[in-house]
């Protein structure tokens, strides 16, 4: 069994995705939660954008509309919505964000996705004389964004796309941002396309600096949510370490923290249970996402605890609070890290501020 095949099996057993007909992937409960967090993270990217919401009508696959999208009715409707609903942002340069369902997912060499899929689209309307400058800047920003989400940033690269002979490179440009899994194949996580629009009286904006009316050039970014979710999950699993763990970005991990209670003295079990419930309330109130179920796992000994921590590692949970009878006496507990598999001692009064600072940084 190859390394990537082991990752597929591990992610399926952990409840992130499964293989269905025609070797296509379907997200399971943990995978859907990860996709939801990734979608929210994308929404916060480039916060000055005008958010136009979701398009109800399904669209054709993105590869068909790579350069023809400015002629689509959806694009026209979005532009009119910008001018009407966001007049202060209707200047060049500006950003539009919208989401749409696609009935036909794009294919890649590593896996397919069971449709339909959600497209996260950003349209950057820029001054024509600075279009290439903006295009290169957007490439760099997007690649950095993906690298920050990755457990192995070096696997991401920018791949220029060949243009048809009838397309002028001054008017059309396209690149893919791809993540590589060695000999197993590559996955495109984002497509960037530049289209220069000429002589369209219905598509004009004032230049934000000069006030001159210009014909914007459009740079479009398209992210296929389900495909990129599976790619990032594979990224977190395919790390080459000896340990079986899922190295998800702390911000995107479906569960950020767990509570493990080592209960070796039955006489103190009620007090330990009360303490666990208190910690659970504190962490929930702070907005941290606890592990599945009630977030608390009771263990009897060190061996049982080690088995539980292996399970949390495979779920990608970054931190686990380990409490025992000693915690009742002096307030000290262990904060165990998924990435290092080491634990540090913290005081109960440090919860949740210490954890919140970790996730903010």
Curated annotation (Swiss-Prot):
Family matches, as Pfam families: HGTP_anticodon
Domain of life: Eukaryota
Any single Gene Ontology cellular-component annotation: gamma DNA polymerase complex
Source species: Drosophila melanogaster (Fruit fly)
Subunit structure: Component of the DNA polymerase gamma complex consisting of two subunits: the catalytic subunit DNApol-gamma/DNApolG1 and the accessory subunit PolG2/DNApol-gamma35.
Transit peptide, residues from-to: 1-18
Expression by tissue: Expressed in ovaries (at protein level).
SUPFAM superfamilies xrefs: Class II aaRS ABD-related
InterPro entries per UniProt: aa-tRNA-synth_II/BPL/LPL, Anticodon-bd, Anticodon-bd_dom_sf, Gly-tRNA_synthase/POLG2, POLG2_C
Main location: mitochondrion
One GO MF term attached to the UniProt entry: DNA polymerase processivity factor activity
UniProt name for this protein: DNA polymerase subunit gamma-2, mitochondrial
Keyword field contains Transit peptide: yes
Example of a GO biological process term: DNA-templated DNA replication
